[in-house]
């Protein structure tokens, strides 16, 4: 930021960067909140510290000297210590930063945040999400709810990519003095003067000495900056907004085409009496291949720009790298449901979605994050889009930025035109409709096109069954008697279908007189006596069923052995097996038939079984 921008005392964040040269790398990067500092003095302070560090041979001593030189330039008390074991090169390690925050009250003298760094981490990687740098704003005696903002430090920093997470509680406006949004041209987000203190530690093995440029006031000797071009601290760029949730795929769903990149938009920040909510940002770190800039601009992805009282406040944030590729998603929290807030615009409806998918750089799902016990994910429909129900789109994850939206919008396809309820639905059947179908149809005349009285046939079938049962006759007995006298067309199956009216009108018309004549004669015989009825039906009673044959275990074993040798034996072989086992030949033949059928059924089942 140029000196002109740094002249705003109450809204400026001054950062003190201490850089070590030589074979060592950046040791400490302190971020403090202080009054304005002239660009010339800070530049001299940075250069002096860098020169002093380059002359020092011991990395620990140089870091200690740098830690002492930083607070002198700022005119306040702070302490920063670096613990580096001797003989250990600055390989990738875990950075541990501790912070202590003074009460957010106006003070004459600003105090810096004490910072303690252990070892020499190379970069904050995705695997070290636990190593995060947290700046806390806690007003005295206030109970706050944190606002988790996922931050992606992208770019190739020594061949790795870093992540950091800021935790900022949703305090009230009274505890957030100076929280404003700058003009759209500047695009600067200015935190309160005494409310936010944070630090970031980056270590990378570079072949040449590198000086770090602070995000607030960059001072570099290797790469001068034109004075007319101020460095923006927080730059807003619309990013890809895709809620990482499992959405119902419509039948006619089509993938949305990539949209052109829109122009930069100003930050969307909403300050409300009970809390504040602003869009999470993504930090872009420039490639350090010989460059002097460590941290670039902070771009925000507008996800929810206003507190919504009807939403529990759980959503997700997409993490991208410098190339715009999605590397992960994390949940972030806004105001709770109990916080009263004004109703949002009618066109903004956000539904919290869970679970969330964690993607890697290749777009593969590697994990899921369940942020809260919410109902299953549902698609949210914007009220402004019902006029185009023919479109049904699901926005895919794309590396190119697109226009941010409050939620994934799915316009349901138009329902198919339903036929009018009053219009009759004709029965289209490839076969001739049966009597039951014709009789059950409403508004069906009693006579069909052939002059057959369907109602009369239905009544006769019902009475025929009652009279048959009163005589104690079965359908099989009636079928056998009629088959013997009238032919095979009057079998037991024909009697069954006639009683159920599962027969065509013509067939029913043909069966009706024959059945009526036979039933009348059977009733006359029954009046003469049961014996006469049995003689008329076909006389002798049915034989008892043969007792089921039971095989001994030895016989079953022998039959299985024969079956394994030859599943289909000849008649002579069956006779020999029956004599050997002392069983009837017919019993052995039936056993082989049943065994083959069982094997066939088992094979069919195996075909459909899921491996």
Curated annotation (Swiss-Prot):
Disulphide bridges, residue numbers: none
Localization: Nucleus
Molecular function as annotated in GO: DNA-binding transcription factor activity; DNA-binding transcription factor activity, RNA polymerase II-specific; DNA-binding transcription repressor activity, RNA polymerase II-specific; RNA polymerase II cis-regulatory region sequence-specific DNA binding; sequence-specific DNA binding; sequence-specific double-stranded DNA binding
An annotated GO BP: brain development
Positions of the UniProt region annotated as Disordered: 62-93
Tissues showing expression: In the embryo, expressed exclusively in the developing brain, whereas in the adult its expression is restricted to brain, heart, skeletal muscle and lung. In the brain, the highest expression levels are found in specific cell layers of the cortex, the olfactory bulb, the hippocampus and the cerebellum.
Major localization class: nucleus
UniProt keyword annotations, A-Z: DNA-binding, Homeobox, Nucleus, Transcription, Transcription regulation
SUPFAM superfamilies: Homeodomain-like, lambda repressor-like DNA-binding domains
Protein name, entry field: POU domain, class 6, transcription factor 1
């Amino acid at each position: 930021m140029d000196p002109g921008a740094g002249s705003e005392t109450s809204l400026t964040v001054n950062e003190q960067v201490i850089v070590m040269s030589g074979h060592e790398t950046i040791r400490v990067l302190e971020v403090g909140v202080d009054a304005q500092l002239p660009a010339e003095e800070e530049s001299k302070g940075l250069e002096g510290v860098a020169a002093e560090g380059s002359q020092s041979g011991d990395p620990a001593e140089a870091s200690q000297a740098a830690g002492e030189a930083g607070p002198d330039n700022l005119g306040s008390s702070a302490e920063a210590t670096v613990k580096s074991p001797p003989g250990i090169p600055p390989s990738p390690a875990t950075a541990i930063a501790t912070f202590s925050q003074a009460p957010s009250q106006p003070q004459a003298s600003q105090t810096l945040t004490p910072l303690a760094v252990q070892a020499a981490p190379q970069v904050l990687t995705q695997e070290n999400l636990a190593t995060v740098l947290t700046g806390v704003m806690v007003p005295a005696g206030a109970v706050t709810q944190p606002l988790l903002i996922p931050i992606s430090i992208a770019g190739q920093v020594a061949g790795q990519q870093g992540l950091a997470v800021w935790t900022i509680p949703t305090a009230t406006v009274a505890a957030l003095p100076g929280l404003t949004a700058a003009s759209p041209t500047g695009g600067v987000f200015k935190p309160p003067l005494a409310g936010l203190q944070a630090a970031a530690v980056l270590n990378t093995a570079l072949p040449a000495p590198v000086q770090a440029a602070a995000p607030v006031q960059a001072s570099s000797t290797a790469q001068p900056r034109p004075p007319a071009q101020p460095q923006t601290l927080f730059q807003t760029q619309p990013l890809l907004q895709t809620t990482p949730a499992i959405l119902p795929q419509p039948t006619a769903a089509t993938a949305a085409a990539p949209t052109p990149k829109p122009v930069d938009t100003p930050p969307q920040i909403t300050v409300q009496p009970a809390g504040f909510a602003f869009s999470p940002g993504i930090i872009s770190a420039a490639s350090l291949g010989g460059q002097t800039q460590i941290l670039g601009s902070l771009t925000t992805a507008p996800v929810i720009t206003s507190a919504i009282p009807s939403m529990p406040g759980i959503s997700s944030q997409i993490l991208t790298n410098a190339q715009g590729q999605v590397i992960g998603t994390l949940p972030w929290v806004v105001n709770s449901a109990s916080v009263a807030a004004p109703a949002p615009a009618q066109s903004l409806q956000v539904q919290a979605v869970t679970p969330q998918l964690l993607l890697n750089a290749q777009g593969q799902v590697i994990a899921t994050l369940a942020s809260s016990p919410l109902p299953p994910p549902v698609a949210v429909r914007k009220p402004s889009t019902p006029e185009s129900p023919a479109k049904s789109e699901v926005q895919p994850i794309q590396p190119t930025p697109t226009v941010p939206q409050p939620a994934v919008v799915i316009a349901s396809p138009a329902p198919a035109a339903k036929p009018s309820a009053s219009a009759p639905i004709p029965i289209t059947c490839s076969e001739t409709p049966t009597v039951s179908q014709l009789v059950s149809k409403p508004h069906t005349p009693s006579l069909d096109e052939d002059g057959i009285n369907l109602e009369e046939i239905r009544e006769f079938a019902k009475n025929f069954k009652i009279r048959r049962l009163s005589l104690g006759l079965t359908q099989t007995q009636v079928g056998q008697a009629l088959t013997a006298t009238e032919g095979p067309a009057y079998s037991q199956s024909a009697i069954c279908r006639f009683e159920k009216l599962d027969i065509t009108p013509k067939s029913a018309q043909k069966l009706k007189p024959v059945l009526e004549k036979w039933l009348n004669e059977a009733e006359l015989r029954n009046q003469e006596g049961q014996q006469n009825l049995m003689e008329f039906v076909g006389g002798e009673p049915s034989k008892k069923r043969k007792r089921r044959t039971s095989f001994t275990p030895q016989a079953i074993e022998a039959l299985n052995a024969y079956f394994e040798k030859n599943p289909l034996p000849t008649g002579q072989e069956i006779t020999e097996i029956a004599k050997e086992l002392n069983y009837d030949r017919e019993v052995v033949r039936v056993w082989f038939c049943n065994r083959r059928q069982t094997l066939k059924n088992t094979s069919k089942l195996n075909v459909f079984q899921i491996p």
